[in-house]
Design a protein with these regions (language model features):
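Juxtamembrane "anchor/assembly" segments of surface/extracellular structural proteins
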Residues: 1-76, 107, 112-149, 247, ...
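Residues that flank catalytic or metal-binding motifs in active/ligand-binding sites
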Residues: 56, 93, 110-112, 208, ...
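Short beta-strand and beta-hairpin "edge-sheet" elements
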Residues: 80-116, 213-215
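Polar, enzyme-active/binding microenvironments
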Residues: 87, 295-348
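Charged- and aromatic-enriched interaction segments used to assemble
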Residues: 106-254
């Protein structure tokens, strides 16, 4: 992508930030834009604490006399928005402009609110595809890193931190994501329709009982109870080459009132905490639970005479028997020229 627009501002704590907007069009030199009094806001999902995916959205407020039509796109990842901390030269947030329609009044000075969602939310519009030529067993780490690479094609984020709260055994040292495997066919239905990459991530992270979040320059798979108990060990993955190493994440507790709360008619509340179990049933109809064992189209008489049969008399009853062979793939225990009542037991 090409840098199309940029702007700089300072937070209420005097921290310098830079907003960069990238488009697929080659616009030549980047153009500086003017931001409003509320230049950039980020909002995180807060409806539930225990949630497999916690996503965020941002609003960049621009003051302009132009229409800036190239900032509105119908593509899922057509326009990228990046927020950088100039003081530490680090990535603060990045995502993509939401595909939507453009509407603006013709007035002398206009404020445009550019809405963006983070890279995890963009996965809702990307279908899962096999990692190789065909479906195969893949580790959780392979699948998750492959999906996150689709979420970030520009490679803004290279790191994935996974807390070591789950283990196969008490003495295991390897990250559980490298030890758990699943077949890729599980992500396709009976009609071969793939799940979205977002649903794939949800199913894997939910199975682990953890939460995936995009925070600054990395992705994190965390467990709130593990953090609350003071554990800081985790595995760091490189999303692009799947290399991993053990590391420690610094964790500190802060009082909300010490951080400071400033708002207008705002409130602080503690949401209810509960356990929730969701059971999903496949409602696709099954046409035939027990299909026919023998396919008539696959059978042919073993004799040149199609009317040949064998007789067997038991008491006063005469039984007629005929034997057939498969055109395709039936295998016998031993090869015989002709099956009859005397050798049938040793052939099948």
């Amino acid at each position: 992508m090409n840098l199309a627009y940029y702007s700089e501002f300072k937070s209420r704590y005097n921290t310098p930030y830079r907003v960069e907007i990238y488009t697929k069009k080659n616009t030549g030199s980047a153009k500086e834009i003017r931001l409003s009094g509320t230049p950039f806001t980020v909002e995180w999902e807060s409806d539930r604490l225990y949630k497999p995916l916690k996503m965020s959205n941002a609003v960049c407020s621009i003051i302009t006399r132009e229409l800036l039509l190239d900032l509105y796109t119908g593509e899922n990842q057509g326009v990228e928005v990046v927020l950088k901390n100039r003081e530490t030269n680090t990535l603060e947030w990045f995502g993509f402009v939401t595909p939507n329609m453009y509407s603006s009044d013709y007035i002398s000075l206009d404020t445009l609110d550019i809405e963006a969602i983070d890279s995890i939310a963009c996965l809702d519009n990307i279908k899962y595809s096999y990692m190789g030529e065909k479906a195969d067993f893949r580790s959780f780490s392979e699948i998750i890193c492959n999906v996150l690479a689709k979420a970030d094609p520009q490679k803004c984020v290279q790191k994935l931190y996974v807390q070591n709260c789950n283990k196969l055994t008490s003495s295991a040292t390897a990250c559980i994501l490298k030890s758990l495997y699943i077949h890729e066919r599980n992500f396709f239905d009976e009609m071969n329709e793939p799940m979205t990459c977002k649903d794939v991530l949800t199913s894997l992270v939910e199975y682990l009982g953890m939460t995936l979040i995009q925070w600054k320059d990395a992705y994190y798979i965390i467990d709130y109870e593990y953090i609350d108990n003071g554990y800081t060990d985790c595995t760091l993955f490189n999303i692009r080459n799947l290399t991993s190493s053990n590391t420690i994440l610094p964790i500190s507790s802060k009082n909300i009132m010490d951080i400071g709360v400033s708002s207008s008619n705002g409130s602080i509340s503690l949401d209810s905490v509960y356990n929730k179990v969701t059971v999903v049933a496949n409602t696709n109809a099954i046409g035939d639970l027990c299909p026919d064992l023998i396919d008539d189209d696959d059978l042919e008489n073993q004799n040149s005479d199609p009317d040949k049969y064998y007789t067997q008399t038991i008491d006063d009853t005469v039984f007629l028997s005929a034997y057939f062979k498969s055109k395709e793939n039936w295998e016998t225990l031993q090869s015989v020229e002709e099956m009859d009542d005397s050798n049938i037991g040793g052939v099948l």
